[in-house]
Amino acid sequence: MADLIFVPIKDQIKDATYSCYDGACGTGGMLTVAQDRLLELAEETGKQVSIHLFGQEVQPETYAICKADMLLKGDGKQAEHISYGSTLSMDGNATRQFDFMLSNPPYGKTWKVDAEKMGGKKDILDSRFNAYLEDGTQLAMIPRVSDGQLLFLLNNAAKMKTDTPLGSRIAEVHNGSSLFTGDAGSGESNARRYLIESDLVEAVIALPEKMFYNTGIGTYIWVLSNKKEERRKGKIQLIDATAMKSPLRKNMGEKNCELTLELRDEIMRIFMEMEESSVSRVFDNREFGYWSITVERPLRLRVYPDRMIPADTFKKAEELEQVQKAIRSVPAGTPTDDWTVFSNATKLKAAALKKIRPFITEKDPMAQPIEGEPDTDLRDTEIIPFTYEGGIDAFMKNEVMPYAPDAWVDQKKTQIGYELSFTKYFYQPVQLRSMEEIVSDLKKLESETDGMLAEILGGVEQ
């Protein structure tokens, strides 16, 4: 991870002081590795640099270890920059910006307590988690309280420098839910939308499973920069490194493999070259966006004027009598397959019509449509990629209208979503065995079992 934030800009490193931050620093391991790697690269390029480490940790034991470790190293001043408490609800670095950031935040962990401290999930106004796009669109990026991992990525993004040549670079580990959890318009999807439409995402790297001690699930490294090199602007690179692993001789908890130096170098080579291959794909940002639209179809009702209306439909008996009289007074020949015409003919008020309609009508696909009133049973949701030629209008014309010519899109319900799917781009179907191989195995099995049945039956007869 340190290489991902330092190596791409190693030739731009100057004689200067840099800052590195980890908002979920644990015992400070990542910060220490980052410091060592930056100093190493600076030495290779003949630069004199110093680095200030900043971190925050919520667990008291690991915070104490981190603090003590920083006190013992160097002049001990780094320890002053390690904060205690929750990064989400008690940001110890609210006014600071950093050159480099890296984290391995908790994933799949509730942040309900933090949400309550921040005023409740629906009322969080923290600018780290609420953003405005260039077109003025406000995005609430508050995820479900059961998993707050994306908030750590947003926290880092909010601390990026904008007034320096290098800007800021971020590398952060997440599980798969950060890529696709949440429907269009949800907090998770809005977070991805903000990061992608702001052109902050350089790459996402899929790591092998069982890479960490405490979990066997697949993990992904998000690489962010707000000063992308020209070739990366408007694009995201996906790297499938799931097969790049070296097995451990002995498992360490869930961890049963590692990335050797050679494998890490290979991942960096793929990242730096940014070329298409079986394990590397480069896409325009729009590839990951989509519209979620609500497709409506009109309600169609057939009227059955002779049906009984329950006595308790109205508070007073005379009200029911007036309604029944109004229905009987509808002129003969008034179409019963058109609710709009029939209801107007009764001359009843809207409130009365609303009460009686469930009892004297039934849905009928052959009846006339009621203008502006959708049939909720026929409501459908469609997902349309941004890359669909012609957009929503073309999709409706090509995919919906041929089968439902009366359909329309409820524009007020249209949402924009973003997701990144490695399965979509790197799926490898299981290779089926050839017929020759199967026949060969069957013949081999037949020869191996030849005479077995005779032996078994012979034993039974005796």
What are these regions (language model features)?
Residues 455, 459-462:
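Soluble, cytosolic/nucleoplasmic coiled-coil alpha-helices used as oligomeric scaffolds and tethers
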